[in-house]
């Protein structure tokens, strides 16, 4: 998770969650979705959590889907850190779906601190 998403706990139960794939303007790939799911699960189990602030490192919040990662997934023999889009990894949802939906399951407000680019799945 640490190469795609970081969580820093601040005073007062504030979780600072950051997308950290600046070379691709925080574009989403299978590893990013898996890291977001892991972050959500970590936050669910964090005692004293009061609020989550989600932001992106660098000059963009999130450039949306990393299309090159989809091409790599189609290549025979390619392995993907977060599974394929077809894999149901979270009940009836895949990691990409749960990375978006899971924030709703947190019992605290989630604030998106959007700056710069925010396209498609990143908006």
Q: What do these predicted regions represent?
A:
Residues 20, 65, 115:
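Histidine-centered beta-alpha loop that forms part of the nucleotide-sugar donor binding/catalytic region
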Residues 28, 67, 114:
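Hydrophobic pocket-lining residues within nucleotide cofactor-binding pockets
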Residues 1-57, 73:
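Conserved CoA-thioester-binding segment of acyl-CoA-metabolizing enzymes
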Residues 56-102, 118:
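Glycine- (often His-adjacent) and acidic-residue-rich active-site loop
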Residues 27, 62, 121:
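Residues that form or flank phosphate/diphosphate-binding pockets in enzymes
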Residues 97-123:
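Glycine-rich beta-to-alpha active-site loop
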């Amino acid at each position: 998770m640490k190469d795609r998403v970081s969580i820093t706990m601040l005073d007062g139960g504030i979780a600072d969650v950051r997308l950290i794939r600046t070379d691709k303007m925080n574009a989403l790939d299978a590893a990013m979705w898996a890291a977001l799911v892991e972050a959500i699960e970590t936050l669910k189990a964090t005692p004293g959590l009061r609020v989550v602030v989600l932001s992106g490192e660098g000059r963009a919040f999130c450039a949306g889907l990393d299309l090159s990662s989809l091409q790599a997934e189609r290549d025979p023999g390619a392995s993907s850190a977060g599974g394929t889009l077809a894999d149901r990894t979270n009940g009836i949802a895949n990691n990409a779906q749960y990375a978006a939906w899971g924030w709703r399951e947190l019992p605290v407000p989630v604030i998106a601190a959007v700056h710069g680019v925010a396209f498609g799945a990143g908006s």
